[in-house]
Swiss-Prot record:
Organism: Aspergillus niger (strain ATCC MYA-4892 / CBS 513.88 / FGSC A1513)
Binding site residues for ATP: S136, R137, T138, G139, S140, G141, K142, T143
Role played: ATP-binding RNA helicase involved in 40S ribosomal subunit biogenesis and is required for the normal formation of 18S rRNAs through pre-rRNA processing at A0, A1 and A2 sites. Required for vegetative growth.
Motif (DEAD box): 245-248
Annotated Pfam families: DEAD (PF00270), Helicase_C (PF00271)
Residue ranges annotated for the Helicase ATP-binding domain, each copy included: 123-302
Keyword vocabulary terms for this entry: ATP-binding, Helicase, Hydrolase, Nucleotide-binding, Nucleus, Ribosome biogenesis, RNA-binding, rRNA processing
Protein name: ATP-dependent RNA helicase dbp8
Lineage: Eukaryota, Fungi, Dikarya, Ascomycota, Pezizomycotina
Family note: Belongs to the DEAD box helicase family. DDX49/DBP8 subfamily.
């Protein structure tokens, strides 16, 4: 967490110039207070089953927090220093990036007053008409980096369809849509959201009316291009600016690739020589980097490429504490229940990631029976439920969100303090995106990965990828294994799991209501 600052006026009295005042800002660094738990605990350590140990030397000791010394006497701020401070502050503003005043005012109402590093690097270049590849870690403000110059250019020549934003998931598309809608509030700008899970006919009608900016997932937009007729998609031929957000996912080859749908979408747009193309990602993959060396018209300037603390070279935020918890394969759910119920974690908003939709569905139902405030997000839920569940979690109506990797990219939920990997991700890059849901924008966060007998090699691969070792999870006065064995948790969790499985088999929703046409999770 960044040191808090509290402005205090300081009067500079001198013989040469009396009655002159300047304000000085004193940065006071306070060591964060830790919640003190009981000094003694009745928990005892009893291992239910022999567990493997990671084949490496564990790090010893905990990170020490040093409180910086503060001066007893404030030094006065000289006039020349005050002018320099003011000059530096002016340089660290959206105005210095040539952002239009109406956009600055709109950002201010959203409490966005100073640009981040990726915004300072990209906004001027995009306003100058350059194609851009922007790499920056999650939570660094990439959406504003492309939406602000897009809206500013649209305001200079407002027509539809001016801009197209492609993004891999429905939830991320909805988030971008809401953010663009908020930023453009002072203008009569019409954005349109095109995603799967909803009726195509209203979307086709809205698309034919030529909205100013379209935010879409590639699959659904490709469906419109292939089936909705030329009148519907004619406006796409006028697009001036296209954005590929989470470009590494959109351009990734292999099974389940979105690349064919992306190519279909781009084929309906003007040629690259007649439009501006922006790619943003948290991971600059070889597929993304290769675009820099592609042939370009001599009339177009070189592609602007910036890589600022991407998840290639600085994958894990320094404010994120990475831990692992060894669990027996047969009691993974019981360990999760105890972990979420400890004194330190009982009130933390958390996301629990699973590898499969079936696991996520079962976990949500089980945790609900164990009195947790929980909701879920996975690909087989109807879109209306996905939106409603995400809204419940954002509004803190649910403390826990059980999700698959559909929630691992781009979603900005600042309140998340804990990420739990119920299943260890098979791909280390997926781990990076998962834990990136917490410790965003300088906040503190923690990730806990449940490690079974077969997961040790996956954990070691993750550690090699991120360049840091996980610490073994611990909490003062708490033995998770002891609580699982001694407090009857195994029986309680086992019953809840059986009831949840029976509910799924009967075709009931998470509230126990019978559904005749409930889509069975596979």
């Amino acid at each position: 967490m960044a040191p808090s600052s509290s402005p205090e006026p300081v009067v500079d009295e001198s013989h040469e110039s009396s009655d002159s005042e300047v304000e000085q800002t004193e940065l006071q660094s306070r060591a964060p207070k830790r919640r003190r738990l009981s000094e003694s605990s009745t928990d005892s350590y009893v291992a239910p089953a022999p567990l493997p140990t990671l084949s490496r030397i564990k790090k010893k000791g905990a990170d020490e927090e040093n409180k910086p010394a503060t001066s007893d006497k404030d030094e006065p701020v000289l006039i020349k220093d005050a002018l320099e401070i003011g000059l530096n502050d002016a340089q660290n503003s959206f105005a210095s990036l040539n952002v239009a005043p109406w956009l600055i005012g709109s950002l201010t109402t959203m409490a966005v007053r100073k640009p981040t590093a990726i915004q300072k690097a990209c906004i001027p270049e995009i306003l100058n008409g350059r194609d851009c590849i922007g790499g920056s870690r999650t939570g660094s403000g990439k959406t504003i980096a492309f939406s602000v110059p897009m809206l500013q250019k649209w305001a200079e020549d407002p027509f539809g369809i001016f801009g197209l934003v492609l993004t891999p998931t429905r939830e991320l598309a909805l988030q971008i849509y809401e953010q663009i809608k908020a930023i453009s509030a002072p203008q009569s700008m019409k954005p349109l959201l095109i995603t799967g899970g909803t009726d195509m006919r209203p979307q086709a009608v809205a698309l034919a009316q030529r909205p100013h900016v379209v935010i879409a997932t590639p699959g659904r937009l490709a469906d419109h291009i292939n089936t909705s007729g030329s009148d519907t998609i004619r406006g796409l031929k006028r697009v001036r600016m296209v954005v590929l957000d989470e470009a590494d996912r959109l351009l990734a080859p292999g099974h389940g690739s979105m690349l064919p749908d992306v190519e279909t979408c781009l084929s309906a747009l003007p040629p690259s020589s007649e439009r501006q193309t922006l790619l943003f990602t948290a991971t600059l993959t070889p597929e993304v980097r290769a675009l820099k060396s592609m042939p370009r018209p001599s009339t177009k300037p070189p592609i602007f490429v910036t890589e600022i603390s991407t998840e290639n070279n600085a994958s894990i935020p320094p404010t994120l504490k990475q831990t692992y918890l060894k669990v027996p394969m047969t009691h993974r759910e019981a360990f999760l229940h105890v972990l979420l119920s400890t004194e330190a974690n009982a009130s933390k908003p958390a996301i629990i990631f699973c590898n499969h939709t079936k696991t996520a569905d079962l976990l949500e139902r089980m945790l609900r029976r164990l009195s947790h405030r929980v909701t879920s997000l996975h690909s087989l839920l109807p879109q209306s439920e996905r939106n409603a569940n995400l809204a419940r979690f954002r509004a803190s109506a649910a403390r826990l969100l059980v999700a698959t990797d559909v929630a691992s990219r781009g979603l900005d939920i600042p309140s998340v303090e804990l990420v739990v990997n119920f299943d260890v991700p098979r791909n280390p890059d997926d781990y990076v995106h998962r834990v990136g849901r917490t410790a965003r924008a300088g906040r503190k966060g923690e990730s806990v990965t449940l490690v079974g007998q077969r997961d040790v090699s996956l954990v070691l691969a993750i550690e090699e990828r991120v360049g840091r070792q996980m610490e073994e999870w611990s909490e003062e006065g708490v033995s998770v294994e002891g609580r699982v064995v001694r407090t009857g948790v195994l029986k309680e969790v086992g019953e809840a799991k059986r009831e949840a499985a029976g509910e799924i088999e009967e075709g009931r929703d998470v509230l126990g209501r019978k559904r005749n046409k409930l889509k069975k999770v596979r």
